[in-house]
Amino acid sequence: MDLQLAGKKALVTGSYRGTGRMIALALAAEGAHVGVHGFEREAAEAVAREIHEQGGAAVALEGDILTDDGAKQLLRETQDALGDADILVNNYGTADAGSWMKSETPDWIDAYQKNVLSAVRITRGLMEGMKAKGWGRIINLGTIGSTEPAARMPHYYAAKGAMATMTISLAKELESTGVTVNLVSPGLIRTKEVEERFIARGKKKGWGETWEEVEPHVLKEFMGNLTGHVPRPEEIADVVVFVASPRAGAINALNIRVDGGTTALVT
């Protein structure tokens, strides 16, 4: 299937590593010109080079989107390198450890800054250009914790819950403009960091020393699903790329859970 993304211009925040990197690679593989964002240019340049080596088009962009000035820098660099963006993937966010009694007021504010305002700044900077063109895609990266939050990390789940409601509000704001807004919500993702963390835990618990040995225990004791494997970053990226494409014009104001069936709910 041709996703009709050739020549589309996409900015992916936090695409210097992890799932964001895979989203940038996948968009470029479909012909999009990708802005790879990092808080430090060197990290973004490494991913941009990787895209170039695979025959794709990419440019490294820098900006501390946790500040207004840093977000303005990223928006300026995006405009200079790409022109008006067609696609924005608000991928950046962090899940810092905490609990109801250990997470203090600054932790809650920090979670909102990282997971909500970072996206708001860039969204507000790009949405008018999309409206003017009559076409655009804004995709926010959420979490299944917005649907079924855990007791741990309440500050993080509260912030991601705000991103979920923000997505619907923005979709209504952009009604009939040709710009769609959706939320893609993964559960546990098999990133390099997740593999390393659970392999280390598995060695202590006697589960084994490889991911193949440890994964069944992760699914049983930490976060199970109906597929029998922990979703890979590539699987999240594939969904994001489809939603970003012209083929997905009827998908709007939706929370798409990509968790292998961890949250097996009718909603």
Place the predicted regions along the sequence by residue.
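Alpha-helical segment proximal to the catalytic Tyr-Lys
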Residues: 128, 172-173, 249
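Residue(s) in the substrate-gating loop at a strand-loop-helix junction
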Residues: 143
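Short C-terminal tail/terminal secondary-structure segment
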Residues: 18, 148, 240-241, 252-267
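Substrate-binding pocket helix/loop in short-chain dehydrogenase/reductase
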Residues: 71, 99-112, 221
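Conserved glycine-rich cofactor-binding loop
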Residues: 16-17, 40
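Short, small/polar-rich loop/turn modules that mediate ligand/substrate recognition or access, typified
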Residues: 175, 180, 251-253
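Active-site helix of classical SDR
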Residues: 123, 159
